[in-house]
């Protein structure tokens, strides 16, 4: 489980005022010096991430944040980063200094409630204060208490963590019965990592194998030959979005087909909203602004999918003079209302809550959002075909195009 991608781990955000003992608590539960601790207020400046296995919960990633109530020059910037963490947190761990529960703690609790996030209270320095009984009492500097604290944390998490967070939904296991034949088309292009497959392909392969399916992986130029060599037609074909038009042209009409991006739109976000958002492409007009959001911060190549290919395809398909902005990493603009469309990447490195948060932010200001692969399928004129395995989403897409 140590190799579980961060995007599939339960995200636990440690929040609290400065010097409440968040970093000391992190060091205690992980059994390592994962974060620097000091008596000086504001020691933690950026978000510190630490992965851990918490059986029977499973793989988690702790997010240690800068404390609230920092009056230094950089305090506001640290606060902004801390609040951004809430967009990707599955659970908030509120660390209090003893029984102190003032405006800072109330603000964290209010923000967690507004986002419908479970909140667990941890009262640190319990040896110095008379702490309430509605949380976990700890002395974060007492290393001998680690086992007892872990037991309490796991018990608290089991009570509040949604079942779908612990039991990650399937990528494609519900689309075909076990022992089906699945063909995956995986181009090896300039953006492919050397000597390995990209994460979405690896996860889809593992998911198919978990459901006892037979998987054939080919490059796009070998797909037609693979179909001829198979004794029976495949039950499902999944391809990289960049070759979706070729795949659709070569796939018999009776065979289900889709893309890795569509599978991830369903796993990580809201496929219904993403399909609805794709219908907005045909309604773009001259001068409209489009935001293209990349979740990771890879080095863009000359033919980059987000910075070059999709912008070019959008302009070619619509025939419009579009203004296109790009953002990458954790950054997501606050002024989304100026955009006519947001195109989000597949989010393979993000957890589901963060992608849902972005969808929700767009929905609040009435801006349609889709993802790279769904956008590409629409631009290639084959989205209806690759949405066909998903009846409800296909119906919403067709309705939105009217």
Predicted feature locations:
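Conserved G1/Walker A P-loop phosphate-binding module
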Residues: 1-76, 80, 84-87, 91
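Short, charged N-terminal beta->alpha structural module
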Residues: 21-24, 152-153, 184, 190-208, ...
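Conserved C-terminal guanine-recognition region of P-loop GTPase G domains, centered on the G4
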Residues: 50-58, 63, 73-143, 170-174, ...
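G-domain G4 guanine-recognition motif of GTPases
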Residues: 65, 95-100, 117-148, 185-193, ...
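An anion/phosphate-binding loop that grips the pyrophosphate of nucleotide cofactors and donors
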Residues: 89, 234, 339
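Canonical P-loop GTPase G-domain recognition
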Residues: 114-174, 181-183, 212-221, 257-260, ...
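Redox- and metal-dependent alpha/beta enzyme cores, enriched for Fe-S-associated oxidoreductases
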Residues: 266-319, 325-331, 336
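C-terminal functional extensions of proteins
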Residues: 309, 334-336, 340-402
């Amino acid at each position: 489980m140590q190799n579980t991608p961060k995007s599939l781990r339960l995200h636990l955000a440690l929040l609290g005022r400065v010097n409440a003992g968040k970093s000391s608590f992190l060091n205690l539960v992980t059994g390592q010096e994962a974060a620097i601790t000091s008596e000086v207020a504001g020691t933690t400046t950026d978000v510190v991430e630490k992965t851990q296995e918490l059986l029977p919960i499973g793989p988690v990633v702790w997010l240690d944040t800068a404390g609230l109530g920092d009056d230094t020059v950089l305090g506001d910037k640290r606060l902004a980063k801390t609040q951004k963490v809430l967009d990707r947190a599955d659970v908030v761990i509120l660390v209090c200094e003893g029984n102190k529960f003032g405006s800072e703690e109330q603000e964290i609790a209010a923000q967690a409630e507004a986002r419908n996030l479970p909140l667990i209270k941890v009262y640190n320095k319990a040896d110095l204060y008379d702490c309430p009984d509605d949380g976990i009492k700890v002395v974060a500097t007492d290393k001998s208490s680690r086992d007892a604290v872990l037991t309490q944390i796991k018990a608290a998490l089991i009570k509040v963590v949604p079942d779908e967070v612990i039991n990650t939904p399937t990528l494609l296991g519900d689309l075909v019965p076990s022992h089906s034949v699945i063909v995956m088309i995986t181009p090896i292009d300039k953006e492919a990592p050397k000597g390995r497959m990209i994460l979405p392909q690896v996860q889809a392969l593992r998911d198919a194998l978990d459901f006892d399916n037979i998987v054939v992986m080919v490059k796009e130029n070998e797909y037609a030959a693979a179909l001829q060599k198979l004794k029976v037609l495949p039950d499902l074909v999944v391809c990289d979005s960049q070759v979706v038009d070729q795949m659709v042209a070569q796939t018999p009409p009776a065979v289900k087909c889709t893309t890795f991006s569509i599978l991830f739109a369903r796993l990580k976000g809201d496929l219904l909203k993403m399909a609805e958002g794709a219908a907005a492409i045909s309604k773009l007009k001259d001068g409209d602004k489009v935001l293209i959001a990349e979740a990771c911060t890879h080095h863009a190549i000359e033919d980059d999918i987000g910075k070059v290919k999709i912008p070019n395809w959008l302009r070619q398909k619509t025939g419009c003079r579009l203004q296109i902005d790009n953002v990458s990493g954790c950054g997501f603009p606050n002024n989304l209302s100026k955009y006519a469309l947001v195109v989000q990447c597949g989010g393979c490195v993000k957890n589901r809550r963060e992608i849902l948060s972005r969808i929700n932010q767009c929905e609040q200001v009435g801006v349609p959002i889709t993802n790279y692969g769904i956008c590409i399928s629409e631009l290639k004129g084959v989205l209806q075909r690759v949405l066909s395995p998903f009846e409800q989403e296909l119906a919403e897409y067709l309705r939105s195009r009217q």
